Amino acid sequence: MKQLTLAKTVKGVGIGLHKGEPIEITLEPLEANSGIVFFRSDLNASYKASPENVINTQMATVLGDDRGFISTIEHLMSAINAYGIDNVRIVLNANEAPVMDGSSISFCMMLDEAGVKELDAPKKIMVIKKPVEVRDGNKFVRLTPTKEPRINYTIKFDNAVIGEQSYNFEFSKKNYIENIARARTFGFLKDVQALRSMNLALGGSLENTIVVDENRILNPEGLRFKDEFVRHKILDAIGDLTLLGYRVFGDYISYAGSHHLNHLLTKEVLKDKDAYEIVSLEKTTQKAYEKVFA
C-alpha cells in the first residue's frame, strides 16, 4: 500500500469562524514523507501538523510559533485522515482555516475534486501497543490496542437538548462520509456574548453552527442526525489524532473529551516509545490493516 497525495491542486473560499472574514484555502500535492503542512501565505510561514506545534486548544486546535498561528484545523485534518491522504500542503491567507458549514463535508468535496495520487513510498500507520490514557476528573480519553480500530465516544451536557449521547464509529472512508462528515460544530446561545467580547466566534452563524438554547435548537432546519453533537465530537477527535502523523490503528475511547485532552493524549503516546509501533504497509504487512482504508 502506497502513500497518497493529491492528484491536483484545488482552491476554495470560506468564512473564518472566529474572525468572521473571508479566507482563501488551497490544497496542494506534496512529495512522499512530507506529512501535512500548513502554510500562511500572508506571513510566508509553514507549520507542520504535529503535537509539538500545537500552542492552544481552548476553542479549537491551533498550530503556531512566535511568527503567528493557524486555528481551527481539526475539521480539515479529519477529512484528510478519512481520505487516507499522507502528504498535502494547505495554503491559507489568514490565521484560521475556513469553517465552511461547520462540518468537514466541504473539505471532503474539495478532496474529491483533487483526487488522489500514489507515491513511490509505502504507507505507514501507528499501531497502538499498550493502553494510554489522560484524565481530568471524570473526563477521559484513551487509546488501546485493537484488531479493528474504532471510536467509542460519549458526551454529557447539562442541557435538555443534548443530554447524554454515545456513538460507536468503525473506521472506513465510506462510513466517515455517510455518518460523520456532515455533523456540524455546535455552541450555546448563552455563551455567544462572552465569546464575541473575546473576539471569538465573530463568524459564527446558523449557517455554520448548531446553536442551542436551554430547550431548543435555533437552526430552522434542525439537526442532520438525532445525535449530531456526539458525531461532531468524533469528527474533531479524528482530526486531533491526525496530528500524530499517521492513521492510528487503535481503539479511541472518550468520555466528555475535548481538544485539550486529545492534545495531551497525543503527547502521552509519543512520550512512551513502547506504546506504539510505526508499521510500514509493505505487501507482507498490509493485509491486516487494509480494511481501515476501504
Swiss-Prot record:
Zn(2+) binds at H75, H232, D236. Gene3D superfamilies: lpxc deacetylase, domain 1, lpxc deacetylase, domain 2. One of its GO terms (cellular component) is membrane. It catalyses: a UDP-3-O-[(3R)-3-hydroxyacyl]-N-acetyl-alpha-D-glucosamine + H2O = a UDP-3-O-[(3R)-3-hydroxyacyl]-alpha-D-glucosamine + acetate. GO terms for biological process: lipid A biosynthetic process. Transmembrane segments: none annotated. It is an enzyme of class 3 (hydrolase). Its cofactor is Zn(2+). GO terms for molecular function: metal ion binding; UDP-3-O-acyl-N-acetylglucosamine deacetylase activity. Keywords: Hydrolase, Lipid A biosynthesis, Lipid biosynthesis, Lipid metabolism, Metal-binding, Zinc. The active site is at H259 (proton donor). Pathway: Glycolipid biosynthesis; lipid IV(A) biosynthesis; lipid IV(A) from (3R)-3-hydroxytetradecanoyl-[acyl-carrier-protein] and UDP-N-acetyl-alpha-D-glucosamine: step 2/6. Its EC number is 3.5.1.108. It holds the Pfam family LpxC. Catalyzes the hydrolysis of UDP-3-O-myristoyl-N-acetylglucosamine to form UDP-3-O-myristoylglucosamine and acetate, the committed step in lipid A biosynthesis. Belongs to the LpxC family. This is UDP-3-O-acyl-N-acetylglucosamine deacetylase. The lineage of its organism: Bacteria, Pseudomonadati, Campylobacterota, Epsilonproteobacteria, Campylobacterales.
